[in-house]
């Protein structure tokens, strides 16, 4: 785990947030507390998917999706986790899925406080980021490769004009839409909770090779 690795992940999430017009806080003074409920939902949902996954590619998908929303949370509150070097993986390791419920719960609690605490968020973001990296080592796959695949997939969540018009005609009362940060592409969100909805042209990540 290195600073350059995190910076690459951060660049990917900035690209995603720019395309989907999600908040990007350049420092803690720009932290978007109004977005914290959504961040909590995303983190909880993706970590739950990771916990229940059994097949290898689904475990990798769940862990990488958890990292994706955690890094997205970091740029939403303007705090970069501290990078901690991990020991090298053992030769011929036996893969196992490691859990980190306590760290996830701690981060969620900090995100739901009435007043956001810089030190508390920094500590818990760092712990979760470290645990995700350690979990990828324990399970025996490249987190960087997985993030590249998942990020490419996530960028296909933008809707074409034809896809958007078809959905809004069929069930427009359930969704909102707006132009994205990319020309001729649209963002569709569920009104209930603001979650981004995938278009028919969405390309799922293929993690079977990892």
Where are these regions (language model features)?
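Flexible "arm" and connector segments at domain edges
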Residues: 1-210
